[in-house]
Amino acid sequence: MAAEKLRRGEDLTLEEAHDAASGMLGGMGTDESAELLSLLARKGETDEELLGVLEAVSEHSERVVPRNSGTVIDVCGTGGDGMSTLNVSTACAFVAAASGCTVAKHGNRSSSGCSGSADIFERLGCDLDQRPGDAASLLEDLNICFMYAPRYHPALAGIADARKKVGGRTVFNLVGPLCNPAGVRDQLVGVSSQDLLGRIPRILHRRGAGSAMAVMSDDGMDELSTSSHGSACILRGGEVYTERVDPEALGLHASSANELRIHSAGGAFHSFVAVLDGRAGRAMAETVELNAAAALVVGGISEGLADGIEAARVAIEGGAASDLLDRFVAKAGDPGMLREARE
């Protein structure tokens, strides 16, 4: 039925999209799944369809149950900007956590750049196959944990062939960053298209988020950047609105995208550590501060970006971010690998 409607160019209801996605995740054949994904992508997915697929993916996922009180947030990007820049979201997660946020970080390996969140955590010596209870304990003890997407969404492996057959972006690329295994709804999401900028906060609101923000830079980065002006679509108090972001008006220094570019996985890892240690160049440090500020706004720690930038800078320059990285690696990684990155 879903395929018939899509062939006619008709939108699916939330329930129809949910049932179609559940079928794909439950063992539907590769050809049938690929046709559904292609038809959805060709038509363009509605919010109802995204919500239906999102609910189905969440139902097929393994869960982490946070024991923390208060708001838990996630910081992630949709990826695909193709700019091979510093892994901002991972550094931002540590800075935000060191500034008072509780961050249940969900992520994967890089799809288009040199290094994704999972690549960074792997280089820290972390076990990407970590049990949900261990992730919850880290979150409780340190206010930060990492959940490797393939570990928590095993059903997605069953549609890998169908996604390859489609050959391009599918609905699962869009909903993946929103399927946090810890049930997090309040998120900072970096996007690389104007269409998603306005839609993601609305979708998260319908999923129960009280606060959320989607951000992008005018130069195409799927995060805020000091290399250009940017936009933030914000959910606050039940309202969704968009603001322009001028880094220089916030007291930051203009940079170029080249100053944020990374050329290897090793370079991405060393830059990540350097930012948290307060040793990175100004462009990288301030870009992370800007995005951490957005995370602090989502988490209710800071009222606005200016306050958040100051809090993030204190966390980096005062050593709290570096100390949190040390404690995280001591509990969940290999301190020797971190020492090597600092040599």
Swiss-Prot record:
It catalyses: N-(5-phospho-beta-D-ribosyl)anthranilate + diphosphate = 5-phospho-alpha-D-ribose 1-diphosphate + anthranilate. Anthranilate 2 binds at R163. GO terms for cellular component: cytosol. It holds the Pfam family Glycos_transf_3. Its cofactor is Mg(2+). Pathway: Amino-acid biosynthesis; L-tryptophan biosynthesis; L-tryptophan from chorismate: step 2/5. GO terms for molecular function: anthranilate phosphoribosyltransferase activity; magnesium ion binding. Keywords: Amino-acid biosynthesis, Aromatic amino acid biosynthesis, Glycosyltransferase, Magnesium, Metal-binding, Transferase, Tryptophan biosynthesis. Binds 2 magnesium ions per monomer. Mg(2+) 2 binds at D222, E223. Anthranilate 1 binds at G77, N108. Its EC number is 2.4.2.18. 5-phospho-alpha-D-ribose 1-diphosphate binds at residues 77, 80-81, 85, 87-90, 105-113, 117. It is an enzyme of class 2 (transferase). SUPFAM superfamilies: Nucleoside phosphorylase/phosphoribosyltransferase catalytic domain (SSF52418), Nucleoside phosphorylase/phosphoribosyltransferase N-terminal domain (SSF47648). Mg(2+) 1 binds at S89, E223. Catalyzes the transfer of the phosphoribosyl group of 5-phosphorylribose-1-pyrophosphate (PRPP) to anthranilate to yield N-(5'-phosphoribosyl)-anthranilate (PRA). Belongs to the anthranilate phosphoribosyltransferase family. NCBIfam families: trpD (TIGR01245). HAMAP family: TrpD (MF_00211). This is Anthranilate phosphoribosyltransferase. The gene is trpD.
